[in-house]
Amino acid sequence: MLLQKEREEIVAYGKKMISSGLTKGTGGNISIFNREQGLVAISPSGLEYYETKPEDVVILNLDGEVIEGERKPSSELDMHLIYYRKREDINALVHTHSPYAKTIASLGWELPAVSYLIAFAGPNVRCAPYETFGTKQLADAAFEGMIDRRAVLLANHGLIAGANNIKMAFTVAEEIEFCAQIYYQTKSIGEPKLLPEDEMENLAKKFEGYGQQ
């Protein structure tokens, strides 16, 4: 099979997305771009994560043509492909329906610098305007909202996070969900004190090289 490693990672991180509470049921999707081969591996549409096997993962090119796989690719394929076409620093994407991120997104709010951990994504996390799922309009809105970030909230929908590898993309999604929870909790008590913009710009640069290489 093509992209065996990427297929196995998508299966593993799909299960982790469920166990970490970042989505429910078949919601959300994951993809990995093998830039050397010019091929994308993406989770199949409507299949339970704990039932998904490596052979269920769909392999496509950047034109969205299926190269290998019998399953239908995720309905959010366009939203994944736009990043791989336009962002050379992104090779993996995790789209979640995590509860706190979705709560903030359903208010149409951006996620401000309530914690230094926001810097995993950038100085803040914008909220892209609502568009119907699975459409080019949603893909365009998501890309614009995340054009210089590593995550964006999707109004009344969820979150998408990206990075140069699947481990970091998942980490960004987890950390932003945690920050959304902190923001929700602080807003329920009072008004959170936000970190200054210059500090967040500095932290965002530090997080670019975060973790083991």
UniProtKB/Swiss-Prot annotation:
Knockout mutant characteristics: Cells lacking this gene show no impaired growth on minimal medium but addition of 5-deoxyribose inhibits growth at a higher level than wild-type.
Quaternary context: Forms homooligomers, possibly homotetramers.
Cofactor(s) the protein needs: Mn(2+)
Pathway membership, UniProt: Carbohydrate degradation
Organism domain of life: Bacteria
Enzyme Commission designation: 4.1.2.-
Enzyme class, UniProt record, top EC level: lyase
Protein name: 5-deoxy-D-ribulose 1-phosphate aldolase
Cofactor stoichiometry and binding remark: Binds 1 Mn(2+) ion per subunit. To a much lesser extent, can also use Co(2+) and Mg(2+) as cofactor, but not Zn(2+).
Pfam families for this protein: Aldolase_II
Reactions listed under catalytic activity: 5-deoxy-D-ribulose 1-phosphate = dihydroxyacetone phosphate + acetaldehyde
One cellular component (GO) term of this entry: cytosol
Chain residues that bind substrate: 28-29, 45-46, 74-76
Keyword Lipid metabolism annotated: no
Family to which the UniProt record says this protein belongs: Belongs to the aldolase class II family.
An example molecular function term from Gene Ontology annotations: manganese ion binding
